[in-house]
Amino acid sequence: MSGKGTKMKSQLGTKKNLLLSLTFVVVALTTLIIGGTVSWSADYATSSVPPTIIVPVDIKPGYCPNPLEVYGSDDVSVAILGTEELDVSEIARDSVRLQEIAPLRSEQRDVAKPFRLYKWQVSGKKLKADYCTDEGPDGKLDLVLYFSKKEILKAVGSTSDGDVLVLRITARNKSGAPIVGQDVVVIQK
């Protein structure tokens, strides 16, 4: 009987850790949406929760606005852009999700310069299709990921021609710190 009790306690501890992790992600994303930044007052020496890293993202690098056509079955390229502070080789590729969708494949190459307002917030503001850049490479490696357009369209749900939507990326770096970023797309029907 004590073996079952120990196993049950172990499973309960795992469930509590999972619940704590999920709560952290929800709080971080809610803070990002409402406040535009995530800040922490915890002391790193006493806290095991790393700060969230906000990263620049470019959907369909080279385009601005970023069209998301509902026709066709091609993949959609999305880049997490490298910066002086962000080495994209430190991102755990298997953790990356766009609207909860895993990428089909990925590669590292320099494709774009970050949009100057990549930490913009959407709360209380009308979305603008030009919250993006069409500037090319900037000399820093980017993580380019390819996602199924069909899966993206299913995730965003019902849309109309010309709708401007925010798509969000989540990931973790190899040290376990959460990563979030976003970009806008314009629906084309």
Where are these regions (language model features)?
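Short, solvent-exposed loop/turn segments enriched in Ser/Thr/Gly
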Residues: 72-78, 92, 162-166
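Bacterial N-terminal signal peptides
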Residues: 22-34
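Boundary/junction segments of secreted and surface-exposed precursor proteins
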Residues: 38-76, 189
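Acidic, glycine-anchored loop motifs typical of Ca2+
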Residues: 66, 70-71, 104-105, 111-154, ...
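Short amphipathic, basic-aromatic surface patches that mediate peripheral association
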Residues: 63-66, 80-88
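Residue-level detector of buried hydrophobic side-chain packing
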Residues: 82, 96, 169-171
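N-terminal secretory signal peptides that target proteins for export/translocation
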Residues: 1-16
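Ser/Thr/Pro-rich, low-complexity mucin-like regions
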Residues: 158-188
